[in-house]
């Protein structure tokens, strides 16, 4: 049977491996056994030797590289098949901690790099659980026990729930306790269940997907906390140079894979707004909207349009999910260019939007993907979704006064499509350069 080490780097066995490991001076040393595991992994692409990690530090970076490439259209799972091989588990535990320490020592807790390391930990759990057959449920039960799910009260998950990584509606509760174990579910509810098998109902309500989500999110939360702890310690303790070197490799890897000079997001480079290319509905919104249409026009239409037009105009063509910080890592553009345009339009409304509805500033922040807060902050990103612009059809229904189509409108279905096409025409004719 595969051990929980392969899934849970926070188990006592995993911590023991870390405690017994020698000096950090050796994390960059070539490990023949690690290379051999990669070579004998079923399905591994062996055509390129650079695909296989030769050291623990290299394996650490490969974990992140796998996650970043996994989101691209050209991803080949055979390039990283060794990461799904349980034989790698002891090296992988060490690599996990090297990666997390490098993220904590080299970057702010709310940085893009730290966030990607946390997300990669959750994604790794999900993919690894999916490779198991009949052992999957047993391993999940063991990992949940290790993570402290037995007798867990939902209030103990406050940080996890507050982060948006887990929803209260995902959980089965009884008297404040989270019911996740099969036997506990049957014992707790069998007297209340009529005309159904308790086992079957458990599979429906607390199925593999719910347990997988809980494991993934709990490990993400602990990874985030560990990175934060390392960050605090790094201000008082000298960081090992190889950890800092790994942090630099993380930076280079993120920049290389998420750069906008190639790959599926080639056309996603942020560019200055070209107001001459705005469609009539957006121009009308910028001029100011009367009471009745103000909220939807500013919060739903303008916020998404301006943010995507400035940061990611090719979203519908690339179809690659992005967050604002992927394109604006320090939020300088968001705070300095995007929000002022939206707020100015809100002030031109009759009456000014925020005078009547100051809470709409919170909704604008939420529509950008930063949750219900006064202003976008990196630490809150992911609490909500970054919404794409409304379609022309929805604008006709919800904001008919703003829909005053011109000739170009007849051939498009979204204001952002209008913007891209008009911008291209302006560039082609030489009327406007970005």
Curated annotation (Swiss-Prot):
Binds 1 [4Fe-4S] cluster. GO terms for cellular component: primosome complex. [4Fe-4S] cluster binds at residues 281, 392, 403, 409. One of its GO terms (biological process) is DNA replication, synthesis of primer. Its cofactor is [4Fe-4S] cluster. The keyword Calcium does not apply. Regulatory subunit of DNA primase, an RNA polymerase that catalyzes the synthesis of short RNA molecules used as primers for DNA polymerase during DNA replication. Stabilizes and modulates the activity of the small subunit, increasing the rate of DNA synthesis, and conferring RNA synthesis capability. The DNA polymerase activity may enable DNA primase to also catalyze primer extension after primer synthesis. May also play a role in DNA repair. Belongs to the eukaryotic-type primase large subunit family. This is DNA primase large subunit PriL.
